Amino acid sequence: MGIQAAEISAILKDQIKNFGQEAEVAEVGRVLSVGDGIARVYGLDNVQAGEMVEFPGGIQGMALNLESDNVGVVIFGSDRDIKEGDTVKRTNSIVSVPTGDELLGRVVDGLGNPIDGKGPIKTKTTSVADVKAPGIIPRKSVHEPMATGLKAVDSMIPIGRGQRELIIGDRQTGKTAVALDAILNQKSYNDAAGDDESKKLYCVYVAIGQKRSTVAQLVKKLEETGAINYSIVVAATASEPAPMQFLAPYSATAMAEHFRDNGRHALIVYDDLSKQAVSYRQMSLLLRRPPGREAYPGDVFYLHSRLLERSAKLGDDAGNGSLTALPIIETQGGDVSAFIPTNVISITDGQIFLETELFYQGIRPAVNTGLSVSRVGSSAQTSAMSSVAGPVKLSLAQYREMAAFAQFGSDLDASTQQLLARGARLTELMKQPQYSPLTNAEIVCVIFAGTNGFLDKVDVKDVGRFEEALLNHMRSKHSDVLDWITNEDPKIKGDAADKLKAAISEFASDFA
């Protein structure tokens, strides 16, 4: 059976026509050594710093050390399946994560992959994890309040939208509780805002190096309260490799910036940055970078400053969005002068200092009002709050000073005794159970009662009961006053003070 020449040429022509001209070219290298989450790779000559590379089996890594003869790559995942001689491919893209509203209500890892078992997340946009912070021109000074619902914080250490307020304290002093209450407190504001995006606040919580059980507990609380609907949880738990714990805060910030850059508002909680610094130290030492103070690398300040500078209040031309940050730092034995705490204190716009001693005395949240400050928040405080909260900080400072002296002398004059009595009641008034944030108007009423002598005749042990009963009275009989404070935001002096005094007096006369 002979094959016709024409047939042969037709087959050849057909094959030539269908031949793909596009040859896939990928720059590949080979693994020289691997261990402790670090791979040394030879042959990736044109790789960029911070570029994503791919190992066999889809494991991803990031090129961090570009040396003359090899590249130091940190591995996002288990290094058990990577061996010497494996090929490593460039992806030609800097480490990016998915961003968008589709992430709300979900729990993701440091690369944006879902880990809550609710199926894949289909986002329309991705963003580079470690982008440059906004410059000076697009920014605006902080002027809108970011209410936490905690009396001690909102009255004395106010936080504004676009601020970075550090929460610092030893282990088990309630640092996460303060941040979680701030997230839960947004529910009433977001519900009241309806479709008005300029009033809503979206929340991103980043767990760095925490126990999985702790993160699961927190997610459960967010789900129970319905706060998960406006929140994203990014988890790089203690069992994740160090590169994931290092990357998670940057990824989460990229997710939060989606809201900031679209004229909306977001709050991000980093829990906690001490563990991120530790994982970065581990990576740096394994990459053979020279150690500095406390064996941290020389650029550990830049690690945190470039992260926290991305939280900002943008001006009118940039859409008026904001990103507020609550970084958490854990101290050892109350030592605020250690390397990482001093670094982050100098980067942030104030700190909430929590003390073990106060916590064990039952003063919770255990805020040390003397050492805690808010450097820019006072301009963001509501008029009503700033007009009633002024005397509180002064009274408590005088009380602390006098209480120290009062231990020595028994015969105190009447004015000192009165100052001590009021200080004790105000301290009691600042206590607040977890998961029970109050609205701005409610805090104004409570503090007004405390500073205007309504508590002077109440026993210290009954202050909590007085506060609860007062709030119930205001909600049931004087909800118009609460609404007036919320909507009008009046300065509480003159007629406004008389109006509030009348409402509280009516209750105080019957309280027993």
Curated annotation (Swiss-Prot):
<keyword id="KW-0139">CF(1)</keyword>
<dbReference type="Pfam" id="PF00006">
    <property type="entry name" value="ATP-synt_ab"/>
</dbReference>
<protein>
    <recommendedName>
        <fullName>ATP synthase subunit alpha</fullName>
        <ecNumber>7.1.2.2</ecNumber>
    </recommendedName>
</protein>
<dbReference type="InterPro" id="IPR036121">
    <property type="entry name" value="ATPase_F1/V1/A1_a/bsu_N_sf"/>
</dbReference>
<comment type="subunit">
    <text>F-type ATPases have 2 components, CF(1) - the catalytic core - and CF(0) - the membrane proton channel. CF(1) has five subunits: alpha(3), beta(3), gamma(1), delta(1), epsilon(1). CF(0) has four main subunits: a(1), b(1), b'(1) and c(9-12).</text>
</comment>
<dbReference type="InterPro" id="IPR000194">
    <property type="entry name" value="ATPase_F1/V1/A1_a/bsu_nucl-bd"/>
</dbReference>
<keyword id="KW-1278">Translocase</keyword>
<keyword id="KW-1003">Cell membrane</keyword>
<feature type="binding site">
    <location>
        <begin position="169"/>
        <end position="176"/>
    </location>
    <ligand>
        <name>ATP</name>
    </ligand>
</feature>
<dbReference type="InterPro" id="IPR038376">
    <property type="entry name" value="ATP_synth_asu_C_sf"/>
</dbReference>
<dbReference type="InterPro" id="IPR027417">
    <property type="entry name" value="P-loop_NTPase"/>
</dbReference>
<dbReference type="InterPro" id="IPR023366">
    <property type="entry name" value="ATP_synth_asu-like_sf"/>
</dbReference>
<keyword id="KW-0547">Nucleotide-binding</keyword>
<keyword id="KW-0997">Cell inner membrane</keyword>
<dbReference type="InterPro" id="IPR004100">
    <property type="entry name" value="ATPase_F1/V1/A1_a/bsu_N"/>
</dbReference>
<dbReference type="GO" id="GO:0043531">
    <property type="term" value="F:ADP binding"/>
</dbReference>
<keyword id="KW-0472">Membrane</keyword>
<keyword id="KW-0406">Ion transport</keyword>
<dbReference type="InterPro" id="IPR033732">
    <property type="entry name" value="ATP_synth_F1_a_nt-bd_dom"/>
</dbReference>
<dbReference type="InterPro" id="IPR020003">
    <property type="entry name" value="ATPase_a/bsu_AS"/>
</dbReference>
<keyword id="KW-0067">ATP-binding</keyword>
<keyword id="KW-0375">Hydrogen ion transport</keyword>
<comment type="function">
    <text>Produces ATP from ADP in the presence of a proton gradient across the membrane. The alpha chain is a regulatory subunit.</text>
</comment>
<dbReference type="GO" id="GO:0045259">
    <property type="term" value="C:proton-transporting ATP synthase complex"/>
</dbReference>
<dbReference type="GO" id="GO:0046933">
    <property type="term" value="F:proton-transporting ATP synthase activity, rotational mechanism"/>
</dbReference>
<keyword id="KW-0813">Transport</keyword>
<dbReference type="Pfam" id="PF00306">
    <property type="entry name" value="ATP-synt_ab_C"/>
</dbReference>
<feature type="site" description="Required for activity">
    <location>
        <position position="372"/>
    </location>
</feature>
<comment type="similarity">
    <text>Belongs to the ATPase alpha/beta chains family.</text>
</comment>
<dbReference type="GO" id="GO:0005886">
    <property type="term" value="C:plasma membrane"/>
</dbReference>
<dbReference type="InterPro" id="IPR000793">
    <property type="entry name" value="ATP_synth_asu_C"/>
</dbReference>
<dbReference type="GO" id="GO:0005524">
    <property type="term" value="F:ATP binding"/>
</dbReference>
<dbReference type="Pfam" id="PF02874">
    <property type="entry name" value="ATP-synt_ab_N"/>
</dbReference>
<dbReference type="InterPro" id="IPR005294">
    <property type="entry name" value="ATP_synth_F1_asu"/>
</dbReference>
<keyword id="KW-0066">ATP synthesis</keyword>
